[in-house]
């Protein structure tokens, strides 16, 4: 079920969430609040993000607050959609489009909608900030997730590393998990063998290759060279 709330307030959104739980007898066992910041307002991009969140919700039911930054020069307005039941998987999703001064006050917008006594996770599936923990959403969240590989604003792995704080992670780490498992298994087969150096190769321009190289260097204590 999708409920449209044009030119609304966070109080009205919270009331609609409560009414939706009553109407649909929804379970309240949400394990976290997930904040998702999107700058791209294309509907196909939003639909792709919502589909991913819906699939993930069956393992991790959450309250998902999606924030889409609109025109900061427009009149201040908050438009929202509340998605529950089949349209939200096992979660409850609020899609909020921010205009005017609200684009610079994301933290204030989401605060009244946070679930009590549950962790808060912030995610930037498109444009990764250089210092996630320094953003308004990042200061609220205990965990911060970026997706540098799909970044569209030119932030590099080096910049993300320089701005790292405890609780930051990037989706690249999950992507290289199978590869790390294979490497660790191969090294375990020869426990007495000393590694003096390593070379790593991968797709040109893919930052996950540099992340894998850093993991090798840290784990083995040797110099690692990236081969193009």
Residue ranges and their predicted role:
Residues 1-122:
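An N-terminal, globular interaction/scaffold subdomain
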Residues 31, 90-91, 117, 140-142, ...:
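A broad structural signal for short, well-ordered beta-strand segments within beta-sheet-rich domains
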Residues 52-56, 110-112, 136-139, 213-221:
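Short, solvent-exposed amphipathic alpha-helical segments in soluble enzyme
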Residues 63-72, 123-125, 147-151, 223-228:
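A generic structural motif
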Residues 92-184:
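Internal, hydrophobic cores of structured domains that mediate oligomerization or house catalytic pockets
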Residues 157-228:
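A contiguous, surface-oriented mixed alpha/beta subdomain in the mid-to-C-terminal portion of proteins
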């Amino acid at each position: 079920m999708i409920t449209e709330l044009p030119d609304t307030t966070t109080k009205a959104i919270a009331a609609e969430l409560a009414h939706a739980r009553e109407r649909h007898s929804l379970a309240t066992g949400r394990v976290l609040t997930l904040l998702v910041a999107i700058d791209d307002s294309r509907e196909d991009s939003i639909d792709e993000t919502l589909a991913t969140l819906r699939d993930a919700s069956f393992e991790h039911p959450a309250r998902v607050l999606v924030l889409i930054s609109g025109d900061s020069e427009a009149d201040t307005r908050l438009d929202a959609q509340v998605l529950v039941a089949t349209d939200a998987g096992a979660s409850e999703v609020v899609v909020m489009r921010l205009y005017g001064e609200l684009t610079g006050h994301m933290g204030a917008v989401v605060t009244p909608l946070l679930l009590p006594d549950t962790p808060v996770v912030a995610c930037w599936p498109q444009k990764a900030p250089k210092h996630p923990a320094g953003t308004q959403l990042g200061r609220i969240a205990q965990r911060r997730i970026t997706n540098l590989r799909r970044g569209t604003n030119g932030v590099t792995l080096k910049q993300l590393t320089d701005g790292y704080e405890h609780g930051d992670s990037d989706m690249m780490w999950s992507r290289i998990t199978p590869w790390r498992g294979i490497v660790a298994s191969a090294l375990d087969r020869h426990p007495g063998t000393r590694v003096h150096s390593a070379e790593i190769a991968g797709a040109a321009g893919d930052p996950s290759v540099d992340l894998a190289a850093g993991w090798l260097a840290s784990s083995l204590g040797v110099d690692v060279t990236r081969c193009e």
